[in-house]
Amino acid sequence: GIDHMSAAELIQRIKNNHGVVKSFESYGGGLPAHDTLSNPFKYVISWNPRNVVMAGEKGAQYIENGNVKIIPYHNVFRHTWSLDVPGLGLMEAYPNRDSLYYQQQYGFEEADTVIRGTIRYPGWSETWYNVVRLGLPNENLTIPNLKERTFAELTEMFLPANGSNGGDIEQRVANFLHISPTGQIMEKMRWLGLFSSEKIGIDAETPAEVMTHLISQKLKLRDDARDMVV
């Protein structure tokens, strides 16, 4: 809500001074403070965890220099911008849902650039892009008896039937995604618990519910940590 309120105030001020909005770009996000980063994702859950898991599921669109750009779900986290944020340094942003909707809501149809984006620390989008490629943020598939299955067994379900050229599950996931088995993306997936032999142990029905549980547990805001709004 902070981004909407500040945008509305700024736009009204421009209109009151007989100005015209020709370009509007807004980037925001809730993040852990830089001096309290405590996990490889450099992120903590400070709002609805389901919304974090399902971010980008409906794709995104925006307008840039008069051209409408449509980003399908599987490419949202691959379509990023680098931002130099004062006091934080280089951050990344990905497109946030339907920016064209806000062009109408804010009342500047004459603008030829309207972009709303979500800010994350560098590396988030690259990792989540591969989580999406695996298919784990899915709330349409109902899987029986998930409670008694392991996290590794759930991940295994999303691999091709041919086993992705053999090896253990980590190697097969890396082969399937065409990424390094020893790189940072795999390290983050491992840390999150996607290859764990531990039972899921909750009354989940969908992969998305399992992912929501995982990030709720692993990406908690510590008692001694601080979050911030950018």
Residue spans of the language-model regions?
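Buried hydrophobic packing segments
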Residues: 7-11
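C-terminal catalytic/substrate-binding lobe primarily of soluble NAD(P)-dependent oxidoreductases
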Residues: 13-230
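Short alpha-helices
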Residues: 1-6
